[in-house]
A protein has these predicted regions:
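N-terminal small-domain helix-loop-helix segment of the aminotransferase-like
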Residues: 2-98, 105
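Conserved core of the PLP fold type I
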Residues: 63-180
């Protein structure tokens, strides 16, 4: 798979596939003719190896709960070490079904009701609701844009921390500004 090339330019219609990005435009924006630039939902085909693995699994007639193989954790550890020189212990890896549920879990785990959680806008909108729906206090630490370059306002971040923040929900790489 390492030498395989993918066509990132092919136009593939997703209309009629229950795609929130395309089929949901009328519900979300009140019209269908808007460009869906609001969500990080890719418009290129999945790699053939991924499609083949999903088909092979789907051919088994029972869809029960999955117990990830232990090798998955080693793969995650190796990837983090190779790409980021980050050594992560096996017990520090928690698999989740998606980022939004993880944001809610983090707000619940690291701050109590009414306690502060810092979010750095502009950011993917579920960061805000993860805090407010968890009955935590939303503390905003807006990023600063200078000549098209976004950065953290560390002085303001310190003030947020001094206001009793118990957690910071960090988006990295940052969506939508792209900083790591």
């Amino acid at each position: 798979m390492g030498d395989q090339r993918f066509d990132f330019d092919a136009s593939i219609s997703r209309l009629g596939t229950h795609s929130e990005k395309y089929d949901g435009r009328q519900r979300i924006f009140g019209k269908d003719d808007v460009q869906p630039l609001w969500v990080a939902d890719m418009d290129f085909a999945a790699p053939p190896a991924v499609t083949a693995a999903l088909i092979a699994r789907a051919q088994h007639p029972i869809y029960g709960y999955t117990d990830p193989p232990e090798s998955l954790y080693a793969d995650i550890q190796n990837w983090l070490q190779d790409r980021h020189e980050w050594t992560v212990a096996r017990e520090d890896i928690l698999l989740t079904a998606g980022v939004v549920g993880s944001l809610h879990a983090a707000a619940l785990a690291f701050a109590g009701p009414g306690e502060g959680v810092i979010v750095q806008p502009p950011v993917y909108f579920p960061f805000f609701s993860a805090v407010t729906r968890s009955e935590r206090r939303l503390l905003l630490n807006p990023l600063i844009e200078t000549d098209g370059h976004w950065q953290i306002d560390f002085e303001h971040l310190e003030r947020c921390a001094a206001m009793g923040a118990k957690a910071l929900l960090l988006c990295s790489p940052h969506n939508p500004v792209g900083r790591v």
